[in-house]
Amino acid sequence: MNGKIWVLGDAVVDLLPDGEGRLLQCPGGAPANVAVGVARLGGDSGFIGRVGDDPFGRFMRHTLAQEQVDVNYMRLDAAQRTSTVVVDLDSHGERTFTFMVRPSADLFLQPEDLPPFAAGQWLHVCSIALSAEPSRSTTFAALEAIKRAGGYVSFDPNIRSDLWQDPQDLRDCLDRALALADAIKLSEEELAFISGSDDIVSGIARLNARFQPTLLLVTQGKAGVQAALRGQVSHFPARPVVAVDTTGAGDAFVAGLLAGLAAHGIPDNLAALAPDLALAQTCGALATTAKGAMTALPYKDDLQRSL
């Protein structure tokens, strides 16, 4: 198949602690990370979104272009500023985020910013793109357009509750996006939030019954991944690594997964899914072994050596 993978949303400059009182400027943002992750694996990826026509925005556009991501639909907005996030890391490499620019340029995405979609292509989005207008309406228009064209939707909620003024808006937008998604990736916490159940088996059953995605993946960190494919459910253990920074692990996982799905299609059974999940899990594991979300994303050669 080898369909193009479009990724829509925010491109962010992450500011990471780097010694006493210093911050390291790193390219990031979950959608931008996924686009670069796919390109590093040899996939055809394109980024859809807005950044400010400012030093950070030009830095992000140049970075993605250098990574061989199609940036023809990555707009520079002179009226807005690029999203900037301070990332705090604890002793285990776990992170918290402080968003410094609100609203940022990515939330001003317009329908005219969208590419023409085609059959066999994928569109991956996160919920930050749904958190405010006009990005919300534009993102839903994109999701509906690629489905009409015969393409596929991948959704990673990547919930940041503090970016939403109305909690009910968050739930309504999540429900609408989940109903359009062919492939869904959630954390355990997100599964509990959306399903209303702290039991992972019950939560998966509830989401499958309500939204009927073809593929639902629940990442459990060191415990691995729970996968539900066409009604079949199985657990896939994780490979052990020493984590330095977990910032880009989920995005690397999604990039590996999408690269596999775009190349082979969504499999009919869990046994056929196993190679794509192994690729995704290896990408996620390797991304935790270095500091920075995008800088740690693995290349195809890294995977071949690891596998």
UniProtKB/Swiss-Prot annotation:
Keyword annotations: ATP-binding, Carbohydrate metabolism, Kinase, Nucleotide-binding, Transferase
* Reaction(s) catalysed (UniProt annotation): D-fructose + ATP = D-fructose 6-phosphate + ADP + H(+)
Q: What class of enzyme is it?
A: transferase
Q: Does the keyword ATP-binding apply?
A: yes
EC assignment: the record states: 2.7.1.4
Q: What does this protein do?
A: Involved in sucrose metabolism.
State the family it belongs to: Belongs to the carbohydrate kinase PfkB family.
Q: What is this protein called?
A: Fructokinase
Give the species. Klebsiella pneumoniae
Upper lineage: Bacteria, Pseudomonadati, Pseudomonadota, Gammaproteobacteria, Enterobacterales
